[in-house]
């Protein structure tokens, strides 16, 4: 929690330093107007504003697998993975999207043996092919194990940990 707070405070400091106004809530672009865009911000401090330049921070939410619930003890979301107090010996990450790769990379650099399981047959399929190739090389160099084209089977919890059964499609 302290690390996340420190990062958030650092971002808010950079906003202030660069004269960026921060609005917390959900935003919707209503229409283009003279001087920029009309934006409706909903939430605790709802308001409509006009801005010439806008940064949209989309946040992130982990997508659960059908029949698998995040208990934040053994089966972790990205939020739970950031709250772990000790480096796990082994860690399995399901999905090689931005969140999965970030979590896997962080824990690998901290010493965990990390395997990333991806259902797609290609690495970072939505990204430019050359960028994906270079990213794959960087992750391989870190020691991140990436399995592509896998089908996730049973996920079982026990006192010793979690077992993820998977097959190569």
Label each PLM-derived region with a short phrase:
Residues 94-97, 127:
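Glycine-rich Rossmann-fold phosphate-binding loop(s) that bind the pyrophosphate
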Residues 2-13, 134-141:
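A non-catalytic, amphipathic alpha-helix used as a structural packing/dimerization or gating element
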Residues 5-94, 165-169:
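FAD-binding core/adjacent interface of flavoenzyme oxidoreductases
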Residues 100-101:
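N-terminal Rossmann-fold NAD(P) dinucleotide-binding loop
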Residues 21-24, 28-41, 110-169:
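A Rossmann-like FAD-binding core segment of flavoenzymes
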Residues 107:
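Short hydrophobic alpha-helical segments of the AMP-binding
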Residues 1-2, 126:
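Charge-dense, low-complexity intrinsically disordered segments
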């Amino acid at each position: 929690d302290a690390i996340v707070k420190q990062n958030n405070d650092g971002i808010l400091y950079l906003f202030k330093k660069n004269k960026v106004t921060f609005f917390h809530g959900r935003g919707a672009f209503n229409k283009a107007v003279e001087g920029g865009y009309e934006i409706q911000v909903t939430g605790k401090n709802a308001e409509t504003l006009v801005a010439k330049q806008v940064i949209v921070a989309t946040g992130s939410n982990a997508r659960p697998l059908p029949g698998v619930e995040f208990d934040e003890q053994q089966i972790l979301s990205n939020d739970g993975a950031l709250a772990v107090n000790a480096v796990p010996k082994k860690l399995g990450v399901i999905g090689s999207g931005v969140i999965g790769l970030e979590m896997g990379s962080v824990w690998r650099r901290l010493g965990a043996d990390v395997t990333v399981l991806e259902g797609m047959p290609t690495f970072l399929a939505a990204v430019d092919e050359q960028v994906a190739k270079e990213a794959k090389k960087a992750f391989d160099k870190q020691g991140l194990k990436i399995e592509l084209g896998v089908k996730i089977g049973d996920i079982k919890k026990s006192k010793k940990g979690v077992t993820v059964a998977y097959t190569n499609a």
